[in-house]
């Protein structure tokens, strides 16, 4: 089932309210929505990078991925199509870019899906409860 960005933005309020430095990659047409949803007192801790998934580095491999799906079919999950795979893999390019640019002079980096609460309200609650534990035990 194909969903556009507005579907995921419906579930972004909790994530965008977290009191953390955030670098947010989004399709250009959603940039203003991100700024509207991110509380104003956190704007100084926010960098939005409007970029289309089509402009991410991994997209150059689309044809190769499509060919791999033909040669090695995998029907377990109907999301197993090139565009979904590219979207998922784009996070690694995005995270690498943030680490290299380091706009907030950070020592720790992580990825969180903007719609984490969509996958279960407890996800965001547990994230907030355990962030210090995660930093202390799983980060350098």
Model-found features: residue ranges?
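Short, acidic, metal-binding catalytic loop of nucleotide-sugar glycosyltransferases
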Residues: 8-21, 37-40
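N-proximal low-complexity "stem/linker" segments adjacent to membrane-targeting elements
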Residues: 1-7
């Amino acid at each position: 089932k194909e969903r556009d960005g507005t579907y995921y933005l419906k579930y972004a309020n909790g994530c965008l309210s977290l009191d953390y430095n955030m670098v947010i990659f989004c399709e250009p047409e959603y940039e203003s929505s991100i700024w509207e949803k991110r509380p104003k007192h956190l704007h100084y801790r926010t960098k939005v990078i409007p970029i289309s998934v089509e402009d991410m580095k991994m997209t150059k491999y689309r044809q190769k991925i499509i060919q791999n799906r033909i040669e090695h079919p995998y029907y377990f999950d109907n999301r197993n199509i090139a565009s979904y795979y590219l979207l998922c893999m784009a996070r690694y390019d995005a995270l690498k870019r943030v680490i290299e640019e380091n706009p907030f002079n950070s020592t720790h980096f992580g990825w969180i899906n903007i719609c984490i609460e969509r996958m279960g309200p407890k996800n965001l609650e547990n994230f907030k409860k355990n962030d210090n534990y995660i930093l202390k035990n799983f980060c350098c």
